[in-house]
């Protein structure tokens, strides 16, 4: 009987220990990173991070912006993996918009210590994201898609007013001129991994987003238990609110905010 009581006491002690460890893991400080890899979304290119990059470099971080070909999900994943393979040490992986799918797929790289989603898709492994998005209000920008030759882009009105609505019109039109044309099949792709299930995540919600439903963004951020900020921004908060986005990335990197 005494032996059984001792085993019961030991089991109870182990339960408390494991529970305490789990609680500590949930509140652990971010691992300090020295690299940041930025991944752009659809209708954009790597230069869309140009306002954020200097702020991160000023904090001493090594920054690389991926150039997605946007020809297929597999091609974009491979482009990001090539960049991740060049990183030396702890790395924060950041995705804007569609690139949330890319970082979810590639974020289990051993060097990746944190994920940052900026108004981004964040599907679960194998999830039909199109069906998920259909449960939320349809964003106006989707009405401006123009298809040709197996690729698509936003027309100028949708780009200026719905994609980049809080930028000066001249700036928005310049970005429209260099937008990346996407494969028609891109958005129907499915991830095989959901790195946010095993890596700490941060999420920037764009409250005035007309390209991705803000309600969908809030759902995704809550589902992944992300550290979340809400910004009164269009879909391109990385351009119109670079300081807020940079500070979110710095937090994920275990560094202090900049003013």
Segments predicted by a language model, with ranges:
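Bacterial N-terminal signal peptides
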Residues: 9-19
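Active-site catalytic motif of lipid deacylating hydrolases and related acyltransferases
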Residues: 29-88, 139
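Gly/Ala-rich beta-loop-alpha elbow adjacent to hydrolase catalytic centers
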Residues: 94-99, 103
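Flexible "cap/lid" loop of the alpha/beta hydrolase fold
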Residues: 108-156, 183-187
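Active-site nucleophile elbow and catalytic-triad environment of alpha/beta-hydrolase enzymes
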Residues: 174-195
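Short beta-strand/loop motif that positions the catalytic acidic residue
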Residues: 203-205
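Conserved loop-alpha-helix segment in the C-terminal half of the alpha/beta-hydrolase fold
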Residues: 207-232, 244, 252
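Post-His helix in hydrolase/transferase enzymes
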Residues: 239-255
């Amino acid at each position: 009987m005494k032996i059984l009581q001792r085993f019961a006491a030991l089991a109870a002690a182990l339960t408390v220990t494991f529970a305490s460890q789990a609680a500590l893991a949930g509140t652990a400080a971010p691992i300090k990173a020295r690299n940041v890899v930025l991944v752009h979304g659809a209708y954009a290119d790597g230069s869309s991070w140009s306002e954020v990059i200097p702020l991160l470099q000023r904090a001493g971080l090594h920054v690389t912006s991926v150039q997605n070909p946007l020809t297929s999900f597999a091609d974009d994943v491979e482009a990001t993996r090539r960049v991740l393979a060049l990183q030396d040490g702890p790395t924060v992986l950041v995705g804007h918009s569609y690139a949330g799918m890319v970082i979810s797929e590639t974020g289990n790289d051993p060097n990746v210590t944190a994920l940052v989603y900026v108004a981004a898709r964040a599907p679960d492994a194998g999830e039909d994201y199109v069906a998920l998005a259909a449960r939320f209000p349809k964003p106006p920008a989707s009405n401006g898609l123009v298809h040709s030759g197996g690729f698509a882009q936003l027309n100028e009105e949708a780009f200026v007013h719905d994609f980049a609505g809080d930028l000066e019109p001249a700036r928005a039109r310049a970005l429209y001129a260099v937008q990346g044309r996407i494969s028609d099949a891109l958005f129907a792709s499915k991830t095989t991994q959901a790195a946010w299930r095993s890596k700490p995540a941060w999420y920037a919600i764009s409250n005035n987003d007309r390209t991705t439903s803000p309600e969908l963004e809030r759902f995704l951020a809550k589902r992944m238990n992300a550290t979340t900020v809400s910004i009164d921004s269009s879909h391109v908060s990385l351009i119109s609110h670079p300081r807020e986005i940079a500070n979110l990335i710095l937090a994920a990197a275990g560094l202090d905010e900049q003013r």
